[in-house]
């Protein structure tokens, strides 16, 4: 793994594909005026890169990479897996998350995937692999950026089944679960793993986000952090299988409590976080 950068990187997210190409050249001039030397690209381009299940199109991304490389910018290459393409949701609706109220979402927004969907995992890993293969020889790519701002929750059947697997691995026996969660309270004793359901508004958290059992709600959040981390590691390992010595990270969000960032940090080559500047900081 490379040990350091050749310079301190100064830049941010750059989405030239959202603008006419005649603007791109002007962008490069503005970057130089601002002493910007790096750009994070390809954060939300999955739909553009993979227009259908068995087709990749890197034409536009090639242009962006070449433009930045020719200007000697450091590139932080994202894997685009934070927002699903419409074709995937149409064919595989189970890739979408199910919300706190038990509603499976349709296509739209971002942070919209179920991390325990095997279909999502399959295509996210495949995309990360294809990106790494295509750009492995580009020396301007300094860091690989997996997904984007991991967060949110899903309460679908896939998550429920994997939660039970996670609990078995942690507690070994159903009696140990009952003891840890003090399920004698309100007559909640479990006798089989498949009696355990996800804690959402339809079950243990029916009163405005307050939980009947802190144990199950806390464990579900621990489980979900691990589920997201598994997705990160899946893509990270796919990139490193092609480019073993590259640096890989993802963007954490300050003191966000939804994920166990201490656990995540051990899996990251660089611990990085989002910095949203406002006018008072400029």
Regions found by a protein language model. Name each.
Residues 15-17, 42-45, 78-87, 142-151, ...:
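Short, solvent-exposed turn/loop segments enriched in Gly/Ser/Thr/Pro and often Arg
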Residues 19-33, 124-130, 253-263:
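Short, acidic/polar
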Residues 26-32, 41-102, 235-242:
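Aromatic-lined substrate-binding rim segments of carbohydrate-active enzymes
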Residues 3-23:
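Boundary/entry segment of secreted carbohydrate-active catalytic domains
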Residues 3, 7, 34, 139, ...:
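Structured loop/turn residues at beta-strand edges in well-structured enzyme cores
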Residues 85-249, 260-273:
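Active-site region of glycoside hydrolase catalytic domains
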Residues 8-12, 39-41, 75-78, 142-146, ...:
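Hydrophobic faces of well-ordered beta-strands that scaffold small-molecule active sites
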Residues 280-282:
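Conserved small/polar residues in nucleotide/adenosyl-binding loops
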């Amino acid at each position: 793994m490379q040990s350091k950068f050749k310079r301190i990187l100064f830049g941010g997210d750059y989405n030239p594909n959202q603008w006419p190409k005649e603007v791109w050249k002007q962008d490069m001039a503005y970057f130089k005026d601002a002493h910007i030397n790096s750009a994070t690209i390809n954060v939300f381009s999955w739909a553009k890169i993979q227009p259908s299940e068995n087709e990749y199109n890197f034409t536009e991304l090639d242009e962006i990479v070449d433009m930045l490389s020719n200007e000697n910018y450091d590139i932080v290459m994202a894997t685009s897996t934070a927002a699903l393409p419409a074709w995937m949701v149409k064919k595989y609706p189970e890739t979408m998350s199910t919300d706190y109220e038990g509603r499976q979402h349709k296509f739209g927004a971002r942070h919209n995937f179920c991390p325990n969907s095997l279909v999502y995992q399959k295509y996210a890993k495949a995309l990360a692999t294809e990106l790494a293969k295509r750009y492995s020889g580009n020396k301007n790519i300094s860091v690989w950026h997996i997904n984007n701002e991991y967060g949110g929750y899903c309460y679908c059947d896939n998550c429920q089944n994997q939660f039970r697997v996670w609990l078995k691995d942690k507690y070994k026996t159903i009696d140990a679960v009952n003891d840890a969660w003090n399920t004698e309270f309100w007559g909640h004793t479990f006798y089989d793993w498949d009696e355990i359901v996800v804690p959402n508004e339809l079950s243990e958290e029916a009163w405005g986000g307050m939980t009947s059992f802190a144990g199950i709600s806390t464990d579900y959040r621990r489980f979900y952090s691990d589920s997201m981390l598994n997705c990160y590691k899946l893509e990270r390992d796919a990139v490193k299988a092609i480019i073993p010595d590259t640096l890989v990270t993802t963007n954490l969000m300050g003191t966000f409590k939804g994920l166990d960032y201490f656990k995540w940090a051990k899996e990251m080559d660089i611990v990085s976080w989002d910095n949203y500047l406002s006018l008072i900081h400029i």
